[in-house]
Amino acid sequence: MISPCSPPLEPPVPPPETPASQALSIPLPPLPLNLPELAFPPSSFQASVPPPPPLPPPPRTTGFAPPHVFGLEKSQLLKEALERAGPAPGSREDVKRLLKLHKDRFRSDLQWILFCADLPSLIQEGPQCGLVALWMAGTLLAPPGGTPLERLVQVAMERGYTAQGEMFSVADMGRLAQEALGCQAEVLCGGLGGPNRDHVLQHIVAGHPLLIPYDEDFNHEPCQRRGHKAHWAVSAGVLLGVQHVPSLGYSEDPELPGLFHPVPGTPHQPPSLPEEGSPGAVYLLAKQGKSWHHQLWDYDQVRDSNLQLTDFSPSRAADGREYVVPAGGVRAGLCGQALLLRPQDSSH
């Protein structure tokens, strides 16, 4: 997460071997007191005694337990709970479920066009949300097979972008993406609104991913906490409310009347983008590292959350852990910024 992150686990130090002089011994059973009454002589009795059982393993040394990793237990519990809930749904099925769930939010005076690239899900280990979001985006950018998350973590640490997995700089995230994924990276400054808005929407309509820092609410949706809950998400889908759907290259959803999709493999005319002053006309489909599922966020809500990332969390500042924060702090590293990623051979 942009929130504090766990230091990498170190392999536990094996316990020292138990010297032979300290080996445990199992005493033989005591001889009966009245040997003459036995049917066999003492020598025969001793010969019939079975050999002692093997020695038990030496006790574990208690002084070399693995170091405590902040947040790991919580993230493991989250992963186990999500795994018990069942397999992660396919991307398209998950999006369809989400749209059905929220269909009452959509303005009835508009028709809706969905552009959405398939993104896998990955649950973060501790607060590595930015690197997890980059990994998800990388599946649309890197060669088949993608780039392992471990590689992203390794490069980020080697370059000094992170101490524990945290990423407080959009510029550093862009440099990491270029090196580790071999893609184009454009740092967007000045917020997601104004002249940047159409640029962002056209980027997603073209099927390219967008990395967004924002403040995370309890339900993972954007909120405004002045950067104290800074988090990362990736968006590769957008739902546009338009007055008219272009006639070329779109088909209506059979289950959701009024929703249209571009027909795969068919040229389609780009729609007219909703005006910025039109409320409830643009929604981003986003994923982040604490859920298997897509979320549907009002574009203006994301814009406003991204634009107020100004302060480093006081609880992080007091927790005694090391963080890599750029000169100028959270405001300089995250506020009003986002990262647009494209394959290396893509034109703008």
Swiss-Prot record:
Species name: Bos taurus (Bovine)
Pfam families noted in UniProt: ACTMAP-like_C
Modified residues (Phosphoserine): S313
Protein family (similarity comment): Belongs to the ACTMAP family.
Renumbered residue ranges of the record's region Peptidase C39-like: 121-241
Residues at the active site: C129
Region of interest (Disordered), ranges: 1-64
Protein encoded by which gene: ACTMAP
InterPro entries: ACTMAP
Top EC category: hydrolase
A GO CC term assigned to this protein in UniProt: cytoplasm
Location(s), subcellular: Cytoplasm
Cytoplasm in keyword set: yes
Descriptive protein name: Actin maturation protease
Keywords attached to this entry: Aminopeptidase, Cytoplasm, Hydrolase, Phosphoprotein, Protease
Record EC number: 3.4.11.-
Listed GO MF terms: initiator methionyl aminopeptidase activity
Function: Actin maturation protease that specifically mediates the cleavage of immature acetylated N-terminal actin, thereby contributing to actin maturation. Cleaves N-terminal acetylated methionine of immature cytoplasmic beta- and gamma-actins ACTB and ACTG1 after translation. Cleaves N-terminal acetylated cysteine of muscle alpha-actins ACTA1, ACTC1 and ACTA2 after canonical removal of N-terminal methionine.
Biased composition (Low complexity): 34-48
